[in-house]
Amino acid sequence: MSITAQSVYRDTGNFFRNQFVTILLVSLLCAFITVVLGHVFSPSDAQLAQLNDGVPVSGSSGLFDLVQNMSPEQQQILLQASAASTFSGLIGNAILAGGVILIIQLVSAGQRVSALRAIGASAPILPKLFILIFLTTLLVQIGIMLVVVPGIIMAILLALAPVMLVQDKMGVFASMRSSMRLTWANIRLVAPAVLSWLLAKTLLLLFASSFAALTPAIGAVLANTLSNLISAVLLIYLFRLYMLIRQ
């Protein structure tokens, strides 16, 4: 059967509209979890204020030089802040991926679904999803740090891994390997969707500072919710595409 991107886009749009409230609630809940965890594990305001003490920002040619000019205590604070942001983001993304994919599965099975039921049903697979998203993020970030293009390629090739992990109950590395093979064979259908997702995420990041005007906490929740909705659309598309490819 011939699969066209237009038909998958149409199916994705219809599902997103029909389940918008549930997907919005999952996105909002995941955003709230991300912000709360980030706040809990982040250094205090007093500690963050120490990062500016005695660090010659104007004389630093880059981030590496800036970190080198910090005291050991400041470097530890920066590491804690970075780890808190990364950890909270990974937790939020894992819950989002599990929740959205379970929504699709439950709706496809003709069952009624709520945000809490979808997240609860995804609980058994969250540890594997967390590891998968961590490894995927690590590979993509390393690729982007090198020449950007390898990172984008990795993001495309690993896009189907979360769907395959949940739908086919694969292991973490098995889903990554299978995703690379299947995506490469269907690159024309996967690449445009992932590139659009990356572009939308980048544009949201550029305007993220404007959300802080609402108060930092509310702005962070709102920005994360919008980011989660963008990711949810991609997950719906990838799930639908994967089911069509398997037929």
From Swiss-Prot:
InterPro entries: UPF0259 (IPR009627). It is found in: Cell inner membrane. It comes from the Bacteria. It is a multi-pass membrane protein. The keyword Oxidoreductase does not apply. GO terms for cellular component: plasma membrane. Its main location: membrane. Keywords: Cell inner membrane, Cell membrane, Membrane, Transmembrane, Transmembrane helix. HAMAP family: UPF0259. NCBIfam families: PRK02868.1. Belongs to the UPF0259 family. This is UPF0259 membrane protein YciC.
